[in-house]
Amino acid sequence: MSTDVELCGLVARLNQRLDSHIRRVADRLGITASQAIALRELGEPMRLTALAEHMSCETSNAGYVVDRMEDQGLVERLPDPGDRRAKLLSLTEAGLRCRGNVLQALSEQAPVEALSAEERDSLVALLRRATT
């Protein structure tokens, strides 16, 4: 088996394990996996289109997730100072607390916890290069 084929298989398996981990964390916190991903990505205010890109989904799907989060008091839409027509998504105090819980839970029993901190840093650097 070629290295490229093996790499594709390993990355796919890791992705499946990460998806399962996110679903377990979300279930434990009483939110959906999509909400957990959105909370992870909303470290700073951003437009819906940027969030959708970070979540690797269509803007309409991200909008549905944000609508639910807004109803739950986790996110609010604020005017974008750079464009009066646009809105920025910003976490509320409750959203910030929930994001902290998500980030903490994601770091516990993560599929990559067997790797040392240095190995995880190397993996992150390699994946960034491969995905940009």
Protein language model features and the residues they cover:
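N-terminal leader segment of winged-helix/HTH proteins
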Residues: M1-L29, L88-E93, E113, D121, ...
